[in-house]
């Protein structure tokens, strides 16, 4: 598959070259906190599929950073360009995510993406790829481990253990809700390891997922709509 997308400039569509590109882009990931101490806007992104997988559906939710209430929601649809290949999720989903980002009326200060950050065999999951391409601070929130190993965290909400790969930490296993499997939390770009954990904890409510990706997941999976309060919708939509 050939692509003219500038996000994948020079990529010939092969798996081998995609992995090489990941290794190159991973060197551009920044693991220092660039998020304001008092951010105004957060965003959550998730991806689903329609038409038996032929259409990629990316959901974006913009939230107030203090109240975690949704301010606006958008869904972008693009033709699915490649099949699922383990470890190459961003090459399949990033075009739709960037389309959804462009629909937001304001730029978020911090982005949460359903998927891996640097907790990835080549340190470039979809949240890291998104962050490098956009320059936005990003955190990856994944439901399952893709790389590394960890000791099972304790049973209580907030219990966490480091995820290690080759002796280096690549993320956290976080018990976000009792009696639920831990989340895989990792920095994507312009967020530190500790910052990724702290921000995830700050955005948890009564659910397993933090609010930004929980709301985006509802839209992307078509399990429900996200209601924007009237006072907010008049301001931003």
Curated annotation (Swiss-Prot):
Principal subcellular localisation of the protein: cytoplasm
Segments traversing the membrane: none
Residues that bind Mg(2+): 46, 114
Top-tier EC class: hydrolase
Nucleus among keywords: no
Family: Belongs to the endonuclease V family.
Name the UniProt record assigns to this protein: Endonuclease V
Species annotation: Xanthomonas euvesicatoria pv. vesicatoria (strain 85-10)
Organism phylogeny: Bacteria, Pseudomonadati, Pseudomonadota, Gammaproteobacteria, Lysobacterales
């Amino acid at each position: 598959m050939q692509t003219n997308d500038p996000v994948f400039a020079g990529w010939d569509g092969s798996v081998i070259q995609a992995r090489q590109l990941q290794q190159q882009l991973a060197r551009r990931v920044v693991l220092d906190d660039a998020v304001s101490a008092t951010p105004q806007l957060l965003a959550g992104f998730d991806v689903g599929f329609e038409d038996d997988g032929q259409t990629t559906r990316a959901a974006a939710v913009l939230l107030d950073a203090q109240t975690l209430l949704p301010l606006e929601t958008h869904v972008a649809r693009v033709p699915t360009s490649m099949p699922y290949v383990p470890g190459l999720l961003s090459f399949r989903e990033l075009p739709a995510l960037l389309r959804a980002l462009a629909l937001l009326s304001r730029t978020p200060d911090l982005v949460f993406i359903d998927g891996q950050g640097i907790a990835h065999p080549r340190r470039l999951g979809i949240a890291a790829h998104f962050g490098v391409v956009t320059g936005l601070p990003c955190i990856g929130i994944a439901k399952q481990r893709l790389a590394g190993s960890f000791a099972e965290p304790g049973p209580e909400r907030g219990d966490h253990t480091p995820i290690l790969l080759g002796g280096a930490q690549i993320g956290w296993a976080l018990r976000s809700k009792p009696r639920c499997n831990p989340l895989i939390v990792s920095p994507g770009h312009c967020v530190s390891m500790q910052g990724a954990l702290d921000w995830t904890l700050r955005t948890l409510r009564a659910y397993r997922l933090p609010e930004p990706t929980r709301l985006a997941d509802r839209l992307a999976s078509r399990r429900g709509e996200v209601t924007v309060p009237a006072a907010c919708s008049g301001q931003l939509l």
